[in-house]
Amino acid sequence: MSQQYPQTNDVPYLFSNTSTAYHTVDICKVNTSLKDSVPRFWLIYIHGGGWSDPNIQANTFSQIRDELLKEKDILAHISGIAAVNYRLSGDPSEGRNARYPDHLDDVKRAIGFLDSRYGFEDRYIVVGHSAGATLAFQLAMEPETSSLPTPKKPLAILGASGIYDLRRLLNSIWHVVKYREEYVHMLEGAFGPGGFAYGEQSEGRCSSEWDLASPAKATSYGSSWCNAQLAMLVHSPDDELVPLEQSTQFATVLESSLPPGVVQTRFDLAGSHDDIWRKPEGIT
């Protein structure tokens, strides 16, 4: 089914001496015609992987994309589907030395590139998994002041198994010894160092940056995301890597600042953290 629609992978979206192999986007064109009255949207996926895993990139969306391409009722409203790559953190020796807001800046560049090519303005939906869900909602929380041209905010965002409060995530898994060092490395690699310990309030500049980067710490979505039509959070209670409370508490934050009915939740998906994109039926 997917072969019926033109697909191009690894399309560069940054053209400068600072571009890397991560500055690419996979594109599948479904129906880019603007000649009829059917409202159509671009669907843009942001992968997870803890801002650092080189084995989890845009191509992990291919299964979900192929499932979507089987749904005629959905396709009637889709202009195209894209999956974004962005610079990673965690291992400078391998070129993975991005630090917040580098990941977010790359996502904005990719969306800006797609908009310049296809002209969808705010007619796009962002789907993010795990760290990709963080990035998706960072687009909505960010004020319209940036050193980069900021694309228009999406009409809808779907966050799957998302990380929305960085400090709370670390505290919630601190008692799990096998995850503790891994999570400290992941979060400090992406957002900067801090003197963290279970149950303590983080101190210093970096802790402030962690909070500034956490979608659950923002309280002004009503003004920063004025065109919001849907904010959907989905999560599995069986998620072994990101606690369900990340989504339940963030839902409360969103409901307090967005109009009634905009926030929708589904916290009954089955499976582990990565089953969301490895077994795409639920998310589709």
Curated annotation (Swiss-Prot):
EC number annotated for this UniProt entry: 3.5.1.9
Give a GO molecular function annotation for the protein: hydrolase activity
Q: Where is this motif: HGGXW?
A: 47-51
Please name the pathway.
Secondary metabolite metabolism
Indicate yes or no for the key word Hydrolase.
Answer: yes
Top-rank lineage group of the source organism: Eukaryota
Reaction catalysed by this enzyme = N-formyl-L-kynurenine + H2O = L-kynurenine + formate + H(+)
Instruction: Output the Gene3D superfamilies linked to this UniProt entry.
Output: alpha/beta hydrolase
Positions annotated as active site in the UniProt record = S130
Signal sequence range:
none
Among Pfam families, the record links this protein to: BD-FAE
Q: Which UniProt keywords apply?
A: Hydrolase
Q: What does this protein do?
A: Kynurenine formamidase; part of the cluster that mediates the biosynthesis of a highly modified cyclo-arginine-tryptophan dipeptide (cRW). Within the pathway, avaC catalyzes the deformylation of the cyclo-Arg-formylkynurenine iketopiperazine (DKP), produced by the FAD-dependent monooxygenase avaB. The first step of the pathway is perfornmed by the arginine-containing cyclodipeptide synthase (RCPDS) avaA that acts as the scaffold-generating enzyme and is responsible for formation of the cyclo-Arg-Trp (cRW) diketopiperazine.
- Describe the family membership recorded for this protein in Swiss-Prot or TrEMBL: Belongs to the kynurenine formamidase family.
What PANTHER family does the record point to? AB HYDROLASE SUPERFAMILY PROTEIN C4A8.06C, KYNURENINE FORMAMIDASE
The protein depicted here goes by the name Kynurenine formamidase avaC
- The encoding gene: avaC
